[in-house]
Amino acid sequence: MDAARNGALGSVESLPDRKVYMDYNATTPLEPEVIQAVTEAMKEAWGNPSSSYVSGRKAKDIINAARASLAKMIGGKPQDIIFTSGGTESNNLVIHSMVRCFHEQQTLKGNMVDQHSPEEGTRPHFITCTVEHDSIRLPLEHLVENQMAEVTFVPVSKVNGQAEVEDILAAVRPTTCLVTIMLANNETGVIMPVSEISRRIKALNQIRAASGLPRVLVHTDAAQALGKRRVDVEDLGVDFLTIVGHKFYGPRIGALYVRGVGKLTPLYPMLFGGGQERNFRPGTENTPMIAGLGKAADLVSENCETYEAHMRDIRDYLEERLEAEFGKRIHLNSRFPGVERLPNTCNFSIQGSQLQGYTVLAQCRTLLASVGASCHSNHEDRPSPVLLSCGIPVDVARNAVRLSVGRGTTRADVDLIVQDLKQAVAQLEGRL
């Protein structure tokens, strides 16, 4: 690993203190190749992609190449990729589209949907789970508050941290339009059974069609999984998949995969303007960031197994060192028996009345990390709702720290941060 890469992706050396970043589930730095792609596009492809002169054509070519790169990364078709500003927009676009689709179907069928009650039958029904990202949870809660939708939040299992397939199937109603379940949880790393959910929903749709009921579509937010494990839309069987660049060493834009966009799978724009992205997401394209996203996707396609193996080795070593240093005081919150999880994620608590996660991190001199999802950082003194949903006791969840390693994290980094945690605990317990 060359010096530039190690500086960007591993531990960070600065005077007078050395810092070790272990919050790669929150965001990642840009790979050097990504920075190069972005800067080259800024210099050479600054033209409007809708224009016919050289810099415009070059910009359009870069966008088309990036679209193909993203499609290759997820095993999809280039024409099914829509560029967006990021994961939040992609997730909102899916939810918005399903509300629109439901009402159009209602109009076409003369509101003949079989229903539990007149009020319920006029609203689309969504199914999700209790550990989703805020960009899924909050739009759905907003729809409920404004009486625009019905939502079932399926609890995850307290045994394995997963959304159970049978619970999701049991929640389906005649008015259900979408099941949205994340591919991997950002706090525990637990992989959700999305492939099985899609398979079962597809079988259910055949029965629904015979009864004149609309299809239930499946969406997964793959933000945390991309770049850490192979993601294939054919294996997953999903209709929508959210892509977030800054989680896999790309820029802070994103994309949405839509299977047979506008034909097999409905998509309705939230914005109206110049007609870019086939009118699904208008606005002059951000060519440099799209170039960087395409390069980040290329790197994942070429190196995913190598990245995954390295991160798993470092994460496993981290957990071994934590157990060796803290013994029975350590509780590994992200280890569930028989359940697959992300290779880079370690959520743990050090048990002790003074060892709340945010307090421990505040005493650390080397470690840069968080107690959980970065979007909840203003509530760091509260136990994580995700951990509580997974059956972690309140006193344990309150002490939680989430460490997520990256492509350049080393065993030496792990040794440093374990010693840092040791001194932080000693400080808090008055032993220093």
Swiss-Prot record:
Chief place of localization: cytoplasm
Protein name (database record): Selenocysteine lyase
Similarity remark: Belongs to the class-V pyridoxal-phosphate-dependent aminotransferase family.
Location within or outside the cell: Cytoplasm, Cytosol
Single GO biological process annotation from the record: negative regulation of cellular response to oxidative stress
Cofactor (UniProt): pyridoxal 5'-phosphate
Keyword check for ATP-binding: no
Active-site residues annotated for this sequence: C375
Entry GO CC: cytosol
Record field: catalytic activity: L-selenocysteine + AH2 = hydrogenselenide + L-alanine + A + H(+)
Disulfide bonds: none
GO molecular function terms attached to this record: selenocysteine lyase activity; transferase activity
Modified-residue entries (N6-(pyridoxal phosphate)lysine), positions: K247
